[in-house]
Amino acid sequence: MDKMALIKELRERTAAGMSDCKKALEVSNWDVEEAISFLKKNGKIKAASKANRISADGLLVEAGNNERAVLVELNCETDFVAHGEEFVALANTVAQTIVANFELVKENGAEAALALKLANSEEILADAISSYSAKCGEKIELRRFVLIDAGTNQSVSTFVHINGKIGAIMLTEGSDAEAARNVAMHLSAMNPEYIFAEDIPGSVLEKFASEFKEPAGFSDKPEKIQETIRKGFVDKKISEVTLLSQKLIMDESKTVQQYLKELKLRLIKAIRFGLGEGIEKKETDFAAEVAEQMSKSM
């Protein structure tokens, strides 16, 4: 019997806290359906669970330093909740708790993160999230996070825009943290499809090549010249979709690669988050969000 898997299933189905799910399963002899009934009888969940609701808003937050850091996405349902003081504080607590237990979380993943105790508290992260979810009436979800630590002569850099909707985390060889953060800022803003040219799938490269249209007089040129022209076309397409080949947003006279090289930096890894990317979000105007919040509080 995989008890952790049963706890996870019960949490996903009920949105109840981890401790409540564990207790419910223990008294129900690890029967999920019986545990759901127990939770309902004890007022730990509402009959209509939030589990299937869409939480595509929220915040991206960072925590850590140049040696090890985390980029976190904590989701809620509306912008109204996302920019409330309590949600912002919760998001930062999540990030700080994860980075404070870096090795454990890196090795064991999200379930280990949710089971962590908060600093100076017996409450675990999953229950803190569930408690605030019950308080605000929205589905709150730790959607994803990425941890990076630095080795010898390496540095971790993070950037999150002030609106909390785009961010990036990077690992570079070299010690110019400010320059690396500038590249993280560029990555967040420009959102290239790929980081390195080597990341581009062969099928995409073939598509680029197929888009080449022969200019006038092309067939009259020597074969080597034709190959050079074709390669130049594909290289230009590659430069448009890769981070290192893009013009630096802060100085378009050079590429990101040239900027890094000038400052004796080498990019090893880079990951960008866009808040709610990949989630289909129901569009609601601000007035409707306020009205919804007011109705929940009455």
UniProtKB/Swiss-Prot annotation:
One Pfam family hit = EF_TS
Where does this protein chiefly localize? Answer: cytoplasm
Family matches, as HAMAP family: EF_Ts
**What organism, scientifically named, is this protein from?**
Mycoplasmopsis agalactiae (strain NCTC 10123 / CIP 59.7 / PG2) (Mycoplasma agalactiae)
Q: Where is this region: Involved in Mg(2+) ion dislocation from EF-Tu?
A: 78-81
What the entry lists under InterPro entries is as follows: EF-Ts_dimer_sf, Transl_elong_EFTs/EF1B, Transl_elong_EFTs/EF1B_dimer, UBA-like_sf
**Family membership noted in the UniProt record:** Belongs to the EF-Ts family.
Q: Which UniProt keywords apply?
A: Cytoplasm, Elongation factor, Protein biosynthesis
Kindly indicate whether the keyword Cytoplasm belongs to this entry: yes
Q: Recorded GO terms, molecular function?
A: translation elongation factor activity
Indicate what this protein is called per its UniProt record.
Elongation factor Ts
Q: Tell me where in or outside the cell this protein is found.
A: Cytoplasm
What function does this protein fulfil? Associates with the EF-Tu.GDP complex and induces the exchange of GDP to GTP. It remains bound to the aminoacyl-tRNA.EF-Tu.GTP complex up to the GTP hydrolysis stage on the ribosome.
